[in-house]
Amino acid sequence: MVFKFPTPPGTQKKAGTTATKPAPKATTKKVATSTGTRSGGVGYRKYQGDALWLPNTTRPEWLDGSLPGDRGFDPLGLSKPSEFVVIGVDENDQNAAKNNKGSVEAIVQATPDEVSSENRLAPYSEVFGLARFRECELIHGRWAMLACLGALVAEATTGVSWVEAGKVELDGASYAGLSLPFSITQLIWIEVILVGGAEFYRNSETNPEKRCYPGGVFDPLKLASEDEERAFRLKTAEIKHARLAMVSFFGYGVQALSTGEGALGSLAKFADGLNNGKGL
């Protein structure tokens, strides 16, 4: 008895043999979708949530995220707006059997930080205010960025660590290998006059935004003068680098206290310790 089976589609018979050709399968191409806005390289997705300084924390109500680099970091509440309690007058009746003390009538919140040009040494009306903290952080961060870069460049070009830079100046002022006809006292006075004059001029500005970002000649390439969104991104990048620079220069100081070396010297000692298997 011989059984015959039906030939499946796509089967070709040749000389008593059977070769099965698989039928093409319909494939569906999946297209990756993203809810974020692509503004970077491959795989980049813009974070849409509220970026905070620590996960699972809540943002203080006085930090609304409108400032560049605002990540809700104020664990001590230093920038919280001041509140004043209005208490009524006590009943000072010496003939009464009992005098009631004044009760709380209202709680008044202080006005936002105001800048006055009358007092150029302390222009802000609120010492512990968000506007003043913001300006101080930005100015200190800019100095820290200059200091970190300046220390590395000076050590690499002169071989003198930033810790010993003051001692070198006592032997005689020089710049780019050229001797300067100034004593250390004269250089201090020149620095005080130039830097102090610049600070007095800056404190004459009553606009808090222009005090931090004057623009004009300080933005010769017009990087942030027209596009507000781009300007905000640049301000955020600046404050991030400023914070890193402040932490870095603090590290410079710790290294100098522990090793007695500058930035490059401490790095060389660290590398030698790793190569010799001594660790830190």
UniProtKB/Swiss-Prot annotation:
Binding site for chlorophyll a 5: 255
A GO BP annotation: photosynthesis, light harvesting
Sites where the protein binds chlorophyll b 1: 47
Induction: Repressed by high light intensity due to a transient decrease in mRNA stability. Also down-regulated at lower light intensities by low temperature or limited carbon dioxide supply.
Posttranslational modification: Reversible phosphorylation plays a role in the State transition process and determines the affinity of LHCII for PSI and PSII.
Subcellular location: Plastid, Chloroplast thylakoid membrane
Xref: Pfam families: Chloroa_b-bind
Sites bearing Phosphoserine, chain numbering: 103
Membrane topology: Multi-pass membrane protein
Keywords recorded for this protein, A-Z: Acetylation, Chlorophyll, Chloroplast, Chromophore, Magnesium, Membrane, Metal-binding, Phosphoprotein, Photosynthesis, Photosystem I, Photosystem II, Plastid, Thylakoid, Transmembrane, Transmembrane helix
Cofactor note: Binds at least 14 chlorophylls (8 Chl-a and 6 Chl-b) and carotenoids such as lutein and neoxanthin.
Main location: plastid
Gene3D superfamilies per UniProt: Chlorophyll a/b binding protein domain
Residues the entry annotates as binding chlorophyll a 4: 241
Recorded GO MF terms: chlorophyll binding; metal ion binding
Biased composition (Low complexity): 10-37
Binding site for chlorophyll b 3: 183, 199
GO annotations of cellular component type: photosystem I; photosystem II; thylakoid light-harvesting complex
Residues where Phosphothreonine is found: 7, 17, 33
Subunit: The LHC complex consists of chlorophyll a-b binding proteins.
Recorded domain comment: The N-terminus of the protein extends into the stroma where it is involved with adhesion of granal membranes and post-translational modifications; both are believed to mediate the distribution of excitation energy between photosystems I and II.
Family of this protein: Belongs to the light-harvesting chlorophyll a/b-binding (LHC) protein family.
Protein name (database record): Chlorophyll a-b binding protein CP29
Organism for this UniProt entry: Chlamydomonas reinhardtii
Name of the gene this protein is made from: Lhcb4
